[in-house]
């Protein structure tokens, strides 16, 4: 099969190709979808079996009335500080509308931070470290920086990896596709990022997010005995 990627292009229309007008997709198979795009050469129509479209999301703040109350908005959404407090002291904003992490678990953490601030209590959550999860099969999860990003940030970064195919529990489950990659600082051993593809990746990422938040080193993770057989052993093995 052939996969064609077209990014940052305006879409004029998209529809089912229909039995009467269906043509052939790039690999010669029967096309079932049709999309009209605009590129440097003008408007053209593409036909394929499937379309994957990532349209993105933007905050709808114009109807909130925050501007009238003296609040400040940005292109990303409503501006809020680390306590989720806006420029209007009695108004707080959490979650997607702030334009930071558009994730449910991040929004929950924002809410707790806002409530703690209102109640005059300290909040210890580290909302700079937020894992992202994709609930496909195999699952995908990531937190922190990639190897390239870590090096660009000035770290002497290294990466350890372990194939899921070599993990006993994954083989038992019949889900042996994927890997665990852990990015760390070569001198300090600090975990800078982690990227997982495979069974239970969305569960395993919490261990690595905790390591980053608690400043646990890769040596300490590797020295922790992980039970056998479990998918979590892949985290330990990526460090070994």
Feature annotation, model-predicted:
Residues 105-128, 155-156, 214-218:
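Internal hydrophobic alpha-helix adjacent to the cofactor/substrate pocket in enzyme cavities
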Residues 45-119:
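FAD-site-proximal beta/loop scaffold in flavoenzymes
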Residues 40, 80-82, 185-186:
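Short, acidic, Ser/Thr-enriched surface-loop or helix-capping motifs
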Residues 26-29, 54, 99, 135-145:
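Short beta-strand to alpha-helix junction loop
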Residues 123-139:
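Flexible, acidic loop-helix segments that line cofactor/substrate-binding pockets
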Residues 119, 135-240:
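Flexible, glycine-rich terminal cap/loop adjacent to redox cofactors
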């Amino acid at each position: 099969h052939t996969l064609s990627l077209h990014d940052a292009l305006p879409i004029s229309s998209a529809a089912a190709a229909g039995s009467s007008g269906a043509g052939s997709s790039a690999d010669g198979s029967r096309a079932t979808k049709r999309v009209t795009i605009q590129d440097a050469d003008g408007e053209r129509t593409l036909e394929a079996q499937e379309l994957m479209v990532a349209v993105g999301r933007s905050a709808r703040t114009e109807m909130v009335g925050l501007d009238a109350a003296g609040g400040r908005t940005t292109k990303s959404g409503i501006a809020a500080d680390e306590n989720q407090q806006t420029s209007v002291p009695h108004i707080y904003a959490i979650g997607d509308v702030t334009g930071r992490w558009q994730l449910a678990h991040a929004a929950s953490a924002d809410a707790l931070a806002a409530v703690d601030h209102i109640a005059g209590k300290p909040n210890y959550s580290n909302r700079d470290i937020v894992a992202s999860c994709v609930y496909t099969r195999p699952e995908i999860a990531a937190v922190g920086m990639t190897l390239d990003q870590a090096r660009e940030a000035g770290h002497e970064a290294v990466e350890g990896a372990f194939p899921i195919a070599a993990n006993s529990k994954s083989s038992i489950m019949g889900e042996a596709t994927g890997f665990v990659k852990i990015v760390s600082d070569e001198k300090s051993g600090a975990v800078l990022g982690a990227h997982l593809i495979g069974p239970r990746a969305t569960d395993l990422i919490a261990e690595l997010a905790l390591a980053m938040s608690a400043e646990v080193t890769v040596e300490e993770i590797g020295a922790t005995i992980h039970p056998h057989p479990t998918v979590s052993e892949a985290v330990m093995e990526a460090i070994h």
